[in-house]
UniProtKB/Swiss-Prot annotation:
A zinc finger (RING-type) spans 353-394. This is E3 ubiquitin-protein ligase At1g12760. Keywords: Membrane, Metal-binding, Transferase, Transmembrane, Transmembrane helix, Ubl conjugation pathway, Zinc, Zinc-finger. The chain crosses the membrane at residues 100-120, 133-153, 219-239, 254-274, 275-295. The RING-type zinc finger domain mediates binding to an E2 ubiquitin-conjugating enzyme. Coiled coil: none annotated. It is a multi-pass membrane protein. One of its GO terms (cellular component) is membrane. It comes from Arabidopsis thaliana. SUPFAM superfamilies: RING/U-box.
Length: 408
């Protein structure tokens, strides 16, 4: 039986990055580092997240800094930032799912239809303010938004289809001879080489179309803000005289302006609610994602291969002070399911789960990841099912499991 003393959840560094402690825990985790994200997530992943990073993470950062230092220590802040980033990624995926896209198109199409109908019905009205031009511009914005959404939706579907076809190579159903299997592998390799140029050209076209669509959507968003101010000024300047001379155009403009305000307030309130939930009720957020999201992380088999420990809390008489770590020993975590279990001594400040912020109770089952960080089994298992990375240092557990399989 071997015994080790851990110096903290935040001080354990993954084996792959032991040469630099700053790679495991960023001293300024709230500042965006584009190089790290590109290295961990591929070429375009960092750019995509850098645009969306301002939403939920701002609320999580504010609430984390506003909390006390005991409740929200640095490891807990890192875990909640990782959860907020995961929510942002899934929010983007959900925003371009088929039901949401259909609802968005139907909603904007209804605005265009109503605006067109009112403009036709009120052709005899003569408003003192150019609200006809404003309604026409509003309808054109809705049309441009629908076009951008359709282009982005098709691009994401095409990329998802290409990813599925490239990650699932053909397998032979029978292994009657080694020559037949090798010929199948050569044919599969040749087909992948032949389709490589086509995939590259399609990817280049997708990138260009996506860039144009994003620029149009950004310009449309900026123009809609300016257009809203212009419409509000014209409606306010017209007053009762405008309402009496052109009631249809006047009230339709009021409705459109009111809907825009409602959507802005709703989005801001939703971001604040999600930020509060990420900081205060992170296990609930993980449970919801675990229930509704598809498996994109580790499988149950990969999770079960991780080392499981059982925490044993020491009594007051058995607790002692560690001079090197300058802390009091809280308990011992013992490896489960082995004849020669490994034991880790946990200090008082490290005997808590960074996900749920609850202290380890006597007999609690813990899961230790390859990077050395440990959490409640019930907390981290659901997280790994959604995302196969450590919630604290973002170490990918599938890398270590694949290496172990190759060694075997």
């Amino acid at each position: 039986m071997s015994t080790e003393t851990t110096t903290g959840n935040s001080s354990l560094i993954p084996a792959s990055s032991s040469s630099s402690s700053s790679d495991a825990i960023d001293p300024a985790p709230l500042l965006f580092n584009g190089d790290d994200n590109e290295g961990n997530n591929g070429g375009g992943g960092g750019e995509r997240r850098s645009v969306r990073r301002q939403g939920l993470r701002e609320a999580a950062r504010f609430l984390s800094r506003a909390s006390s230092g005991r409740v929200m220590r640095e490891p807990s802040m890192l875990v909640r930032e990782a959860a907020a980033e995961q929510l942002e990624e899934r929010q983007s995926d959900w925003a371009y799912s088929k039901p949401v896209v259909v609802l968005d198109i139907v909603w904007n199409l209804a605005f265009v239809s109503v605006a067109t109908a009112i403009l036709v019905m009120s052709r005899k009205e003569h408003p003192i303010m150019p609200l006809r031009v404003w309604l026409l511009g509003y309808a054109l914005q809705c049309v441009l938004h629908m076009v951008c959404v359709c282009v982005e939706y098709r691009r994401r579907n095409r990329r998802r289809t290409n990813r599925t076809t490239t990650t699932t190579p053909p397998r032979s159903r029978s292994s009657s001879s080694s020559s037949s299997s090798s010929s199948l592998e050569e044919e599969a390799l040749g087909s992948r080489r032949n389709s490589g140029v086509q995939d590259l050209s399609l990817g280049h076209l997708d990138t260009e179309s996506s860039s144009v669509a994003k620029h149009l959507e950004s310009a449309n968003t900026m123009f809609s803000f300016i257009w809203w101010i212009i419409g509000f000024y014209w409606v306010s300047a017209g007053g009762q005289e405008l309402a009496q001379e052109s009631p249809r155009i006047y009230w339709l403009s009021i409705v459109f302006l009111g809907f825009d305000v409602f959507f802005v307030v709703f989005c801001v309130a939703l971001a604040c609610v999600i930020g509060i939930a990420v900081c205060c009720c992170l296990p609930c957020i993980i449970a919801v994602l675990y229930a509704v999201a598809d498996q994109e992380g580790a499988s149950k088999e990969d999770i079960e291969q991780l080392t499981k420990f059982k925490f044993r809390k020491l009594g007051d008489a058995n607790k002692h002070t560690n001079d090197e770590a300058q802390g009091t020993t809280e308990g011992i975590m013992t490896e489960c399911g082995t004849d020669s279990p490994i034991e880790h001594t946990l200090l008082q400040e490290d005997a808590e789960c960074c996900i749920c912020l609850s202290a380890y109770e006597d007999g609690t089952e813990l899961r230790e990841l390859p990077c050395g960080h440990h959490f409640h089994c019930s907390c981290v298992d659901k997280w790994l099912y959604i995302n196969a990375t450590c919630p604290l240092c973002k170490y990918n557990i599938l890398k270590s499991s694949n290496l172990d399989r190759e060694e075997v």
